[in-house]
Amino acid sequence: MRRRCRTSELRASVGGNHPGAGQSNFAVVLTNGSRRTCWVRGFPGVAFVDGRGDAVTPDPERARGEEQPTVTLTPGASAWSAMTFANPAITGVTTVTPAALLITPPDETTSISVRWTGGEVSNTGKASVPQVSPFRAGDAP
């Protein structure tokens, strides 16, 4: 019987930036590291944090109006969510360089910490609050 994927069964990663039209675009990826098939549905929880684990930016928003498919993950398969925000170099807002991105799978309360290598992000929420999309099958477009 298929069940929802648990944090302990998943590995997390963040893809490289694919910038466009003043936006920074990253793929938040969850990969099934277990020996059983499971599924994810919905949005990731994400938080930019410093070296102590304290949040350094406003909470990202969920993209509205997007379908939330159930993504079946066989062992080794991945699902990805698009995380988009305005390029801080263009908006001129104050910034911070996070140490990590905490990724929480849908309907879970335990996060996976991934080292952040994507550079500066706005720490004010004034120009652009990051948005995340629902998970889709695959490891990114």
Which role does the model predict for each range below?
Residues 62-88:
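Intrinsically disordered, low-complexity Pro/Gly/Ser/Thr-rich segments with frequent PxxP/GP/PP motifs
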